[in-house]
């Protein structure tokens, strides 16, 4: 099964639909170039200054000290399409950890109150200007709670996508995790990771 756009419960979403304008209190960093990892991180922290392209590039270089970077390769490597190791190291600089979620587990055991947000890696359509190409590429997105509701803060969206409460969030996560090549990271404070208190079954 491929990762298709989240539709949710149509009847429920129509009855609880929010105004079209994005709530002003939500920070939603939009896609530019291929900086989806940067956008996902800043959207998780709800802070445009949490990380910069230069910060992530420095982390990449630290993790790969033997990489010979010519000006041409530096441009390629700095395109923002960073792997999970860069994201995990970036979170650690802020006192947070990324917990990889085993897709065989039930998302019902996630202690949502102890999770700041989620970063997902899933296939996304490639676009050339206004044209959507018949190709897929892995893409980082952020999902988190703001003002008592959960939102999909995918940087490719024009505005935050309202998911709903905890029950709707779990349905959203289950839906995507059933798909091929979809992975989930739980963003939690260091002490939560140390005590595994992101789990409701411990």
From Swiss-Prot:
This is Josephin-1. Its EC number is 3.4.19.12. The keyword Hydrolase applies. It comes from Rattus norvegicus (Rat). The active site is at residues 36, 139. It catalyses: Thiol-dependent hydrolysis of ester, thioester, amide, peptide and isopeptide bonds formed by the C-terminal Gly of ubiquitin (a 76-residue protein attached to proteins as an intracellular targeting signal). It holds the Pfam family Josephin. Residues 1-20 are annotated as: Disordered. Residues 23-202 form the Josephin domain. InterPro entries: JOSD1/2, Josephin. Monoubiquitinated. Ubiquitination activates deubiquitination activity in vitro. Its main location: membrane. PANTHER family: JOSEPHIN 1, 2, JOSEPHIN-1. GO terms for molecular function: cysteine-type deubiquitinase activity. The modification Phosphoserine is found at residue 15. Keywords: Cell membrane, Cytoplasm, Hydrolase, Membrane, Phosphoprotein, Protease, Ubl conjugation, Ubl conjugation pathway. It is found in: Cell membrane; Cytoplasm. GO terms for cellular component: cytoplasm; plasma membrane. Deubiquitinates monoubiquitinated probes (in vitro). When ubiquitinated, cleaves 'Lys-63'-linked and 'Lys-48'-linked poly-ubiquitin chains (in vitro), hence may act as a deubiquitinating enzyme. May increase macropinocytosis and suppress clathrin- and caveolae-mediated endocytosis. May enhance membrane dynamics and cell motility independently of its catalytic activity. Interacts with beta-actin/ACTB.
